[in-house]
Amino acid sequence: NRRNCGSELITNRKKYCSFSCIYCECGWNKIDTSIQVPLNKREDIKKALYKKLSESTKEFNTTIDSITFSGNGEPTLHPDILGIVEDVIELRNQYCPQAKITILSNSTNLVREDVFKALQLIDNPILKIDAGTERMYKLINEPVSCKFEQIKQKLIEFGSKCIVQTLLLRGECKGERIDNTSEEEFTAWLEIVKQISPKSVMLYSIDRETPEKNLEKLLIPELEQYAERVRALGIETNTY
């Protein structure tokens, strides 16, 4: 789920992701991520960001407070993600040192050494984990390949620098009951969060149209009930 984070640097309307989440506003996956597809080149991204930052700060006197990697899919699928992150940090330091760099990631590529390193360099690595068990992970996220245990262990290894992002929902998909708010599921998820000990947690629910129609949106008062259980662990938690 990608919420609006400001003006877009490079527009790409095609979804390219290692998940096919039942709640994703971008719809079901239509591109096979196991094959090579044309992506924006590192040097083109750097040029576009240079143009944007130099124009915004010099000509329009705009204060930039955030640079965000998001888009319609998983940004860490880019083979040059480490170099791109290093370029962004270089330009940020030059033109808007006050700005925080954020990435929204589904955590699947933390198994790649270059991705793990790249995300460690970022101010706000927002890393997703929507389930407490392998079964619910497969039902909600419909992953291409990455195993739940791999994601869990890499998030624990990543530790307190990350911000954990989780979408809570209930519903039905393909005849299966979906519910990551049940006592069993939420307790399992909570134990993982405890082991990660993140900087903070973001709990949110469905905001836009979803590809699977039989899903229930949780309202803020209910999200707050779950947030209180996370706060009881001493972890800052926000609801959206």
Model segments located where?
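N-terminal pre-triad scaffold of radical SAM enzymes
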Residues: 1-27, 66-69
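Short, acidic Gly/Pro/Ser/Thr-rich loop/turn segments
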Residues: 12-16, 31, 134, 171
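Conserved Radical SAM active-site core
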Residues: 23-104, 108-121
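Amphipathic alpha-helical segments in well-structured domains
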Residues: 42, 85, 186, 219, ...
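Hydrophobic alpha-helical packing residues
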Residues: 49-52, 88, 158, 226, ...
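Conserved AdoMet/S-adenosylmethionine-binding subsite of the radical SAM
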Residues: 77-204, 209-216
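Binuclear metal-ion centers of metallo-dependent hydrolases, dominated by the metallo-beta-lactamase
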Residues: 219-240
